[in-house]
Amino acid sequence: MSLRIVSSISEIVDVFEQRGNSEYGGEDVTQIEHALQSATLAESESASAELISAALLHDFGHLIHSLPDDAPDNGIDDFHEAAAAKSLCEVFPDSVTEPIKLHVRAKRYLCTTDKNYFSKLSHASVTSLNLQGGTMSDQELHEFESYTYWQDALRLRVWDDLAKDPKIHTPELSHFIDFLESSLI
């Protein structure tokens, strides 16, 4: 699978315009709705521009691969977190790409450390959790906590899991362009 490396915000906008209306992995929202909800939640909590950008772009990897929308239902882990981080690394700093790269591990971490977190996951998120390795071992927990941006990844993960409501209205993508621009390398 070839990976698209983006070099500008206009390329990111183009990808959202071309693929953003695709299904968001078995949820009742599209990819763009999920991204906008995540970023809106981050903004509502006064997150930094970099973390708002990470919230907007955390699932960008789903938009740049050629797998079907239902890949997780077919037992396929698309490693979207790594794809997104790699695709965006030439235009954004680690403060954007590292929380993106860690947000899947953050779900595993939260399901291991918070007894109630697993019960908050949607069916689709439980399916992907199993593909992504399930809960963490003690060694994996300690390794996760050693990453510089692990706490940002946890915040991002919570917004990610809340951003699946088809009734929520958010600002348009254009609202978040200033956050993206201020986060550029």
Labelled PLM ranges:
Residues M1-I185:
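Metal-dependent phosphohydrolase cores
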